[in-house]
Amino acid sequence: MNILSCSINTFKELLYDISGVEVGQHFYWQIGGFQVHGQVLITSWVVIAILLGSSILAVRNPQTIPTDVQNFFEYVLEFIRDVSKTQIGEEYGPWVPFIGTLFLFIFVSNWSGALFPWKIIQLPQGELAAPTNDINTTVALALLTSVAYFYAGLTKKGLAYFNKYIQPTPILLPINILEDFTKPLSLSFRLFGNILADELVVVVLLSLVPLVVPIPVMFLGLFTSGIQALIFATLAAAYIGESMEGHH
């Protein structure tokens, strides 16, 4: 119990320190004595509006013979379903909405930063950036994933889920506990680092050379942005499947 308590306290302190990581000048709101990252909320609302608008457009008038738009969204849904089924197994059904939401939010957020350099928008104070450019967003998504796989394991196995911490031998208890903390950290830092680096490269090139020159870098950013969204969603599904099956 002392090991678990120390690990939790250390993890909480680490998350608090991470939340203060800044690159560039952030745009803040003061709400009820709290300092809120306004640029994350603004760009997140833009991303959510794009996703909601696209969803409404896709289901507004479904056809027996699908249109091009309907075909596209059906393909996206099938792709997400296949990823979930491959990683989670036969009980993937209830998790498709969660995995799909993660994938689509991260994908559109990443692409918004790759296609449109938010930092060039002039604000009285601070600057805008893609939602996934902020460590608080990626940590929040990673923690949601952690909650999801704990919930999946406890729902499937009950308290027997915690037997995994002493398998194959109780000596590995500290390492197995540490693994639950390293998973969200690796998820969040991988996504944050890649998206931040991509946006910084594009902004620097735009400030130094004509618009045409950074275009190849922007295309590379689009590719890596899509890959990062897929990696995050795939790992999230794999962690959920692992917690339900009980194997590593």
UniProtKB/Swiss-Prot annotation:
Pfam families: ATP-synt_A
Superkingdom of origin organism: Eukaryota
GO molecular function: proton-transporting ATP synthase activity, rotational mechanism
Alphabetically ordered keywords of this record: ATP synthesis, CF(0), Chloroplast, Hydrogen ion transport, Ion transport, Membrane, Plastid, Thylakoid, Transmembrane, Transmembrane helix, Transport
Signal peptide bounds: none
Protein localization: Plastid, Chloroplast thylakoid membrane
InterPro entries xrefs: ATP_syn_F0_a_bact/chloroplast, ATP_synth_F0_asu, ATP_synth_F0_asu_AS, F0_ATP_A_sf
GO cellular component, one term: chloroplast thylakoid membrane
Membrane disposition: Multi-pass membrane protein
SUPFAM superfamilies from the UniProt entry: F1F0 ATP synthase subunit A
Family, per entry: Belongs to the ATPase A chain family.
Primary role: Key component of the proton channel; it plays a direct role in the translocation of protons across the membrane.
Assembly and interaction partners: F-type ATPases have 2 components, CF(1) - the catalytic core - and CF(0) - the membrane proton channel. CF(1) has five subunits: alpha(3), beta(3), gamma(1), delta(1), epsilon(1). CF(0) has four main subunits: a, b, b' and c.
Name of the protein described by the UniProt record: ATP synthase subunit a, chloroplastic
Biological source species: Pelargonium hortorum (Common geranium)
Lineage, top ranks: Eukaryota, Viridiplantae, Streptophyta, Embryophyta, Tracheophyta
